[in-house]
């Protein structure tokens, strides 16, 4: 006895349409992908090549001096490089942690019903939409020791002026500026998460006797974890790449207390004019950022995949 299995014509038609749709998407995407490959790929290849040379702007023809991995080993042996790594890590960890905490606080407040909530939301967006260069200039004026607004206010209250950009507090002052500008980003992401929370679940928990703190701890916070991770991943990458504000506020000083990796790369390229070493620093910087942000991104996509299945 023979059992024959036939595939319904509808299923075959569905698969055929799916293949056609996928191939159409691929063909329409290929021109843009090719342009992106040229625009991004070619400079990356050239920069990696130059990181293997002894190219210096003060030595004609040095862009052809192939020296292998010498730039990388010199950078990794440099105490200035590791000092920049330390400053970058402190800057990133403290700034992103404060932005996350304040973002959660402001998002919870903005999720409540109160008079003027729309105005407050609009005002919160202002720091985020200002370009970093303008933010750096604006806060440098506020931080001026003799004529700055902050020290003027302290003087009217009877306090001594604070050297905001001095050796001891310069990094903290730079962190304050980044927190001021980037907390709204965290707030918007987390507010979107709060507004997607199932109200029926919250109402059921409250009906069972859960207080506000318990609802936040066991329902709201776990629901917000993916949103916090998205915001944290973007902000870690953003903080690592931050240059404008730091350069305009402190030039990386006093000394090297605010010299992050981006400022260190700039100083090497545009003060020492060592392009080969600068490109090596840039590639090390890329690996450094990926090593920190990749676990967050991987966990985020892994959680999304688990939730989908």
UniProtKB/Swiss-Prot annotation:
One GO term (biological process): transmembrane transport
Keyword field: Cell inner membrane, Cell membrane, Membrane, Plasmid, Transmembrane, Transmembrane helix, Transport
Keyword Transmembrane helix: yes
Subcellular location: Cell inner membrane
Lineage: superkingdom: Bacteria
Membrane topology: Multi-pass membrane protein
Name of a matching Pfam family: BPD_transp_1
Ranges where the ABC transmembrane type-1 domain occurs: 85-296
Location (main, coarse): membrane
One GO cellular component term noted in the UniProt record for this chain: plasma membrane
Transmembrane spans: 25-45, 89-109, 123-143, 174-194, 221-241, 246-266, 278-298
Role description: Probably part of the binding-protein-dependent transport system y4oPQRS. This system probably transports a sugar-like molecule. Probably responsible for the translocation of the substrate across the membrane.
Family statement drawn from the similarity comment of this UniProt entry: Belongs to the binding-protein-dependent transport system permease family. MalFG subfamily.
PANTHER family per the UniProt record, alphabetical: BLR7065 PROTEIN (PTHR43005), SPERMIDINE_PUTRESCINE TRANSPORT SYSTEM PERMEASE PROTEIN (PTHR43005:SF1)
Name assigned to this protein: Probable ABC transporter permease protein y4oQ
Native species: Sinorhizobium fredii (strain NBRC 101917 / NGR234)
């Amino acid at each position: 006895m023979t059992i024959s299995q036939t595939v319904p014509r509808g299923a075959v038609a569905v698969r055929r349409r799916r293949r056609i749709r996928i191939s159409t998407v691929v063909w329409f995407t290929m021109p843009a992908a090719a342009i992106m490959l040229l625009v991004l790929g070619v400079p990356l290849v050239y920069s990696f090549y130059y990181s293997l040379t002894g190219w210096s702007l003060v030595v004609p023809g040095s862009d052809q001096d192939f020296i292998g991995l010498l730039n990388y080993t010199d950078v990794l042996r440099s105490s200035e490089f590791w000092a920049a790594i330390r400053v970058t890590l402190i800057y990133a960890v403290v700034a992103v942690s404060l932005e996350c905490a304040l973002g959660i606080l402001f998002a919870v407040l903005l999720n409540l019903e109160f008079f003027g909530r729309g105005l407050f939301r609009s005002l919160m967006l202002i720091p985020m939409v200002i370009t970093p260069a303008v933010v750096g200039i604006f806060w440098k004026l506020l931080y001026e020791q003799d004529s700055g607004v902050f020290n003027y206010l302290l003087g009217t209250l009877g306090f001594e002026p604070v050297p905001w950009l001095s050796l001891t507090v310069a990094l903290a002052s730079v962190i304050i500026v980044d927190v001021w500008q980037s907390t709204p980003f965290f707030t918007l992401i987390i507010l979107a998460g709060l507004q997607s929370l199932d109200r029926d679940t919250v109402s059921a928990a409250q009906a069972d006797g859960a207080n506000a703190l318990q609802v936040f701890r066991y329902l709201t916070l776990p629901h917000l974890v993916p949103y916090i991770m998205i915001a944290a991943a973007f902000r870690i990458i953003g903080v690592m790449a931050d240059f404008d504000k730091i350069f305009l506020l402190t030039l990386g000083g006093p000394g090297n207390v605010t010299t992050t990796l981006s400022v260190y790369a700039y100083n090497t390229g545009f003060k020492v004019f060592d392009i080969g070493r600068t490109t090596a620093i840039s590639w090390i910087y890329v690996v450094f950022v990926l090593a920190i942000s990749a676990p967050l991104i991987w966990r985020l996509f892994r959680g999304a995949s688990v939730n989908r299945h």
